[in-house]
Amino acid sequence: MVFRIASSPYTHNQRQTSRIMLLVVIAALPGIAAQTWFFGWGTLFQIVLAAITALVAEAIVLRLRKQSVASHLQDYSALLTGLLLAVSIPPLAPWWMVVLGTGFAIIIAKQLYGGLGQNPFNPAMIGYVVLLISFPVQMTSWLPPYEIAATTPDMLDTLRMIFTGHTASGGDMTLLRIGIDGISQATPLDTFKTSLRAGHSVEQIMQYPIYSGALAGVGWQWVNLAWLVGGVFLLWQKAIRWHIPVSFLLTLALCAALGWLFSPATLASPQLHLLSGATMLGAFFILTDPVTASTTNRGRLIFGALAGVLVWLIRSFGGYPDGVAFAVLLANITVPLIDYYTRPRVYGHRKG
């Protein structure tokens, strides 16, 4: 009998990084389709720009670091970073914004720390926050869903808007944001926060066209449900674990329910929190990043719950309408501490 001597690890996971990343990209297709349906071609163009920028930036840095370009690009991590950033920004944002944000995410937030597996913060959310802080007007200029939009740009006008800022007829973002009621539109969360500050009641706000006949805003609830479908696919394929999305969504729902129960005149309802903004995208595609999330099961539950609390606090009392990106980055900071106190006890040893 011949014995083969080998070093650890003695058990192997057949699912490579590239396969997991590819599964996440596939799972994102329903969300991308929904955003394209309700907000136009801009989402697809932003994804293409972000993907090209991510791959080029990654290749340049890898070449400078004298590492294999082909092998690293084939793990699809750069592609996924670009995709997540692209679907997070307004579809008609200027082309240079997605290029700048994606380049910052890849070069500064990922490669500067040593590349995949070394970055402490989610690169896509770093890129998003940099853009949001630097260009708040452009980053909050979402088009109204086609159902309540007075004007919807076609494919060519979308390209012109992204690269020139104007349509063929001379229209600009101000014109395209006008809804059927003749008023400039914003996202449901942004509308809710802005209207409350203006002294409007929740009952009045819910009569706005953006909420007409919808639980959490026209179009946005379907976009979130589409991302939920993709998230369920990831759970089914075991590409992610259930702990983070479940604890995040339950905690966000609990905080929203308690807040709405005690102050229904000033705080948003649970369904608005769960089915608007980037809730489902954050729960299944961003918070579950294996590099920047907690690595223990108890830690994942704590990590997700912490992010849920932070999202509710930022949305309810902060200066930004949607707090997913900030919540993710703040939760990333706590990961080493969470992992330290939730690491499993070594078999045969007592807790020290």
UniProtKB/Swiss-Prot annotation:
Residues bearing the modification FMN phosphoryl threonine: 187
Q: What name does the UniProt record give this protein?
A: Ion-translocating oxidoreductase complex subunit D
Write down the top EC class of this protein. Answer: translocase
Q: Which domain of life is it from?
A: Bacteria
Q: Where in the cell is it found?
A: Cell inner membrane
Concerning its family, UniProt says: Belongs to the NqrB/RnfD family.
Chief location bin: membrane
Q: Which GO terms describe its biological process?
A: electron transport chain; transmembrane transport
